[in-house]
Curated annotation (Swiss-Prot):
The chain crosses the membrane at residues 35-55, 81-101, 102-122, 135-155, 164-184, 223-243, 268-288, 302-322, 328-348, 352-372. It is a multi-pass membrane protein. Coiled coil: none annotated. GO terms for cellular component: plasma membrane. One of its GO terms (molecular function) is transmembrane transporter activity. It is found in: Cell membrane. It comes from the Bacteria. It holds the Pfam family BPD_transp_2. Keywords: Cell membrane, Membrane, Transmembrane, Transmembrane helix. This is Uncharacterized protein MG120 homolog.
Amino acid sequence: MNALNYLKHRFLFSKDKFWYAPFKQKQRRSIYSTFSLIVLSFIVSFFLIVAIPGIKGGTFLEIFTRLFKDRINIENFARQIAIYTLAALAFSFCMSVGVFNIGISGQMMAGANFGFMMILKVFPESFRPAFGGQIITILLMILGSVTVAMVVAALKVFFKVNEVVSAIMLNWVIVLVSAYLVGTYIKPEKTDTSQFYSIELPDAFALYNFSDVQQKYGWLTSLVIAIAAAIFIAVLMKFTVFGHKLKSTGLSVTGSQAAGYSVKKYQFLSFVISGILSGLLAAVVYTASFEKQLTFSDVGDFGITSVPITGFDGIAIGLIALNSPARIVIVSTIISFVTIGAKPAGLNAATASLVLGIMMYFAAIYNLMIYIKPWRMIVKLNISKMNEAAYDEFQNEMAANLETLSFQRFLDKQKRKHDKERMVWFDTKRFEEYQKKKQATLQTFHENSSQNLLQYWKQQLLVADVKRLTFKWDFLTFKHQQKYILRWYKGKNKKQTALENEFASLNEAISQKLEEK
C-alpha cells in the first residue's frame, strides 16, 4: 500500500509539474500547438476528400482502418514508420547541435552502395554466414554513410563550407556514382529495360530474413531498430553529459566556447552520429523488404532526375516533431497512415499527396499558435476574461508550491546523506504537505473566480445594453461558465448551493431584462 500511495503522489506531482512549472511552458505550448494543428489538418483533409466528386466521406476514416485488413499493408506500415523515424532522427540529431544536415539521402545511398558492393563483389560467393550476416550488412552501410557524413562535417568545421551547399552537391554526386557502380558491376544480367536496380542481396545478409525463426519479418526488425535508435538518442540527449554539451553547442556557440567546450568537436561528432543513423536507414530501406535490392525507381530509374526523397521526408518530420525522439515516432506513425493507408482506402496518388502535404504544412506552422494561443482562448471561454488575472495568480502559486516541494525533497536527501541516515522508502510526507497547499490554492482560485464572475454580471445587469447583438452570445457563454465553475465543487455543500442560488437568480433577472427588450 505504501508503494502504491507513493506512486500515486509521484504521478500527481509529475502531472502538476507538467501543467504549472515555468520551465515546462515551452514544452506545453509546443505540444498544444502541434496537437491542435494536426487535428485542424485532419478536419481540412476530411472536407477536401468529401469535396472530391465520387469519393465518400468515410474514405478519410478508411485511411486509418482499411490497411489493417491486409497483412502486406500492415508490414509496409510498420516498415514505413521505421523509415520515417530513422530519417527524422538522423536529421534532428544534427539540428539539435545547430547544423542542418540536408544530406541524409546521399549518406543513405552511399551506405547502401558500399554495403551492396562489398557483399556482392568483394566477399567471396561462398561466404554466407549462418548467423550475423545482417550485422555485417548494417556495419558496412554505417561505414559508408559515416564516411560521407564526415566529408560534410570536415568541410563545415575545418573549411567553413556551408553544410547545406556541400551536402546537396554530395547528394547528386553519390546518386550518380552509385548508379554507375550498380550499372557496371552489380546489375542483373536479365532485367526489365524500364527499371534500374541491383542484384538481390543474399538472404544471409538481408534484414528481410533475419533468421530461420524470423523469415520475412524485415518489418519487425526495422521497427525494433528504429525504436531502439529513438530510445538511445533520447537517453543520450537527456541523461548524459555528452548530450547536454551537444545541446549547449546548438543553443549558443559563443556560450559553449565560453564554457570551454570544443564547438568544432561536437559539431563533427553530431555528423558522425547522424551518419550512423543514415546507415541504419539504408539497411532498413534497401534490405528489409522482399526486393532486397538497391533500386533507383524513386529517382527516375535510368534517367535519374532526383535524389531519394526519404531524407527530405525525415527533415519535414523532424521539424514538425521539434527534434524530439518521442514526438518523431508519433509524427512518423501519423504520416505513415496516409502514406500506406491511402491506396487501400481508394485514394489516388495525387489526392494522397495533397492530404499528406496539408497535414505536414499545418503541423509545421506550430509557431503560429504562439501568437494565437488557443490554450488561452479555452481558459477565457471557461472562466471568463475577467478571471485571467486570477488564473495567472493561481499558476504562479502552483509553480511556487512545486518549487518548494522539490527544494524540500532535495534538502531532505542532503540531510540524510550528512547524518548518514537510512533511506526511507516510499516516504509521502512532503507530497502530502504539497497536496494540502495545492487544495488551499485551488480553493482560493475557485472562490475568487466565482465572485469575480458574479460581480461582473451583476454590474452588467445594471449598465449593459441588452439590445447589443453580442449580448445574447455573452449570456450563453456566462451559462457555460457557470456549469464549468460549479463542477469545481464536488458533492453538495453550502458553498455550492449558495453559488447555484446566486447564479439562478442572476439568470432569471437577465432573462427578464431580455424579454423586456
